[in-house]
Amino acid sequence: MARYRHSRSRSRSRYRRRRRRRSRYRSRRRRSRGRRRRRSRRGRRRRGYSRRRYSRRRRRRY
């Protein structure tokens, strides 16, 4: 029983990770698309922050 429970949690975490990766790619695509359309200070600042955050996450993963 314990073993089954463990495997279940493991698969769940894996699914969550995959989902996050997908959303990340999607957001990246949308950002490049809207970049030309509107140039706002808010979007610019957000981009820099997210970039820093992703670099940190990448380091941890690899």
UniProtKB/Swiss-Prot annotation:
The keyword Chaperone does not apply. One of its GO terms (biological process) is sperm DNA condensation. GO terms for cellular component: nucleosome; nucleus. The keyword DNA-binding applies. Residues 1-62 are annotated as: Disordered. It is found in: Nucleus; Chromosome. Testis. InterPro entries: Protamine_P1. Keywords: Chromosome, Developmental protein, Differentiation, DNA condensation, DNA-binding, Nucleosome core, Nucleus, Spermatogenesis. GO terms for molecular function: DNA binding. Coiled coil: none annotated. Protamines substitute for histones in the chromatin of sperm during the haploid phase of spermatogenesis. They compact sperm DNA into a highly condensed, stable and inactive complex. Belongs to the protamine P1 family. This is Sperm protamine P1. It comes from Notamacropus eugenii.
